């Protein structure tokens, strides 16, 4: 029987929960919210698990988004996943939101995933055939004018187009808990808290032209 995974995501503008088994979605719930995840997440977990007709003893692991994204959302998701995993003695899988966008893209070439920071710069990472070819980084719009041969995807694309005129865009919906569950099926879970990917400017080198 395919292992069942409970997946949680509240790293960006939505909060979502899914129970998946391989590529199959057993139950899923999502809600748009930029705040209030701490109050909404556990009731959503209870609802989704009830509809999936699973107990924690039926799960192989818990998957959670590690960001980058909303600091509060990432922190809430990781804390919830860690608490549930400890209570049920389950391992965890952390999934980068940047990698999740690349995974979701119906695009096999060179892709630059660009996510909103709500500031003057962007979270970003470079991929080729869905595999990372750079570490995650923070960059301003001028940096992306130096990139040649890359398409762009992510929730920062619209602002990037406005700032730089970039036109090669891969249309990719922002990932949700379903995507995290599918990705986690191919990863090795561990009995430790996944590390958050906050990418604050103080922790990285700001790329400029």
What are these regions (language model features)?
Residues 1-25, 36-39, 93-209:
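Oxyanion-binding and handling regions
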Residues 2, 59-62:
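Phosphate-coordination loops involved in phosphoryl transfer and adenosine-cofactor binding
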């Amino acid at each position: 029987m395919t292992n069942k995974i409970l997946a949680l995501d509240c790293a960006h503008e939505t909060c979502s929960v899914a129970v998946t088994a391989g590529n199959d979605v057993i139950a899923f719930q999502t809600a748009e919210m930029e705040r209030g995840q701490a109050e909404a997440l556990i009731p959503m977990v209870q609802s989704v698990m009830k509809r999936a007709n699973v107990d924690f003893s039926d799960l192989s692991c818990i998957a959670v988004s590690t960001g980058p994204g909303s600091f509060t959302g990432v922190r809430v998701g990781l804390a919830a996943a860690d608490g549930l995993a400890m209570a049920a003695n389950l391992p965890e899988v952390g999934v980068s939101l940047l990698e999740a966008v690349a995974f979701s893209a119906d695009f096999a070439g060179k892709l630059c995933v660009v996510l909103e920071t709500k500031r003057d710069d962007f979270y970003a990472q470079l991929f080729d055939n869905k595999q990372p070819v750079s570490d995650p980084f923070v960059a301003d719009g001028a940096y992306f004018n130096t990139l040649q041969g890359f398409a762009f995807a992510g929730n920062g694309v619209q602002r990037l187009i406005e700032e730089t005129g970039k036109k090669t865009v891969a249309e990719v919906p922002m990932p949700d808990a379903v995507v995290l569950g599918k990705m986690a099926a191919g990863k090795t879970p561990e009995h430790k808290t996944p590390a958050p990917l906050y990418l604050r400017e103080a922790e990285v080198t700001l790329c400029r032209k």
